[in-house]
Amino acid sequence: MKKEKHLKKIISICIFIIVVQGVFLFYSFFFQSKESIYFDGINAIRKNDNYYFAVGSNNDNDKHYEKAKVSVYDEKRDKLFEKLYNVGFNSAYFGACIEDNGLIAVGSYEKTKKDHNALVRRGLIVRYDYDGSIVFSSEFKLLDNTKFTNVISVEDGYYVIGQSIYKSTDFGNEQGGGILVKYDKKGNVDWYKSLGSSKEGIFNDFYLSDDFIYVVGQLNDNVGVLCKYKLDGELIYQKEFDNNIFNSVYLVDDYLYICGSSDSSALLLKLSLEGDIITSSYYDKVSNAKFNRIIYDDSLIVIGSSFNKNYDGIIVKYGMDLEELSAVTYGDDKNDYLTDIIFDDGNYLVVGYSVYEDKNYLSKFIRYSEALKVLGVEK
């Protein structure tokens, strides 16, 4: 029985790796091709008292290049304007944060024709004012393929996380993998730290407390990682978790909550601040599931996706000891991807994108009640 169970786990991991690599190759090919398939996706949503800010990408141009975008909406979510990052070739934003006088967006872009032909990107951080004008933009390239996944603003600058690896067969560089970069307010690099290898590793999300930075991601295709850093970048600890992938982290009442996946099940963990697991919960009601994002509002809310012929979104509410309170799936269209969630005026606002029968990808807003009832969908 143990041998059979171990074999099933290995098969599940192999299937997951194949799916992930397949998605990456499709993504790269999709935006290099000149097909007329339309793509418009939202990867992150932020809100202040007056506006909603969504970042992502679309390919609404003659050459069908993917272009990083910032979209600004009023309180009724009517779009006021949208700005594309029209530098280089393909680009995308994956994370954002709001400041008193503007927005910071982070992602990646192909700067040169050589980058474009090699399918490699540079990390990108851009500061916008509230009118959508660029205040500064700065690139980061440790190894030949780099992207930023999230950003947090602090008084003296910005913390940014992501990945920098060799896409080619190059070896020999001890740096690379997941990256943590500290910028000043003008977009200059103060310092950076890397963890992993020159071929693997990524930081997907982080949480900033008063004195420490908690970062989650993966070292390779099936090893999740939790790191605790001082604010100056000194590594306090690195904890590795086999057969796991970590996508998001939140800190509540001196406990860390991390979501992601384990084999073919979505995963939620409760840990001490020293990185020791207290309890875990596996969401296996649907096949090939993963959690992408976690937030807190009296309870834990996680969003993610599952795959069984088509991709469906999932949203689950948990108590603080990881007892499941309610769960729903979202599958109105052929494929549905939920990418981010915020608490908004007593409800939950979820963003993402869907693939329709005509093969076009369109972004959407989905508003849920606290009881996880769909109140409205806006495309």
Predicted regions and their residues:
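A sequence-level/structural motif corresponding to short, flexible coil/turn segments enriched
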Residues: 21, 25-379
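N-terminal Sec-pathway targeting helices
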Residues: 2-21
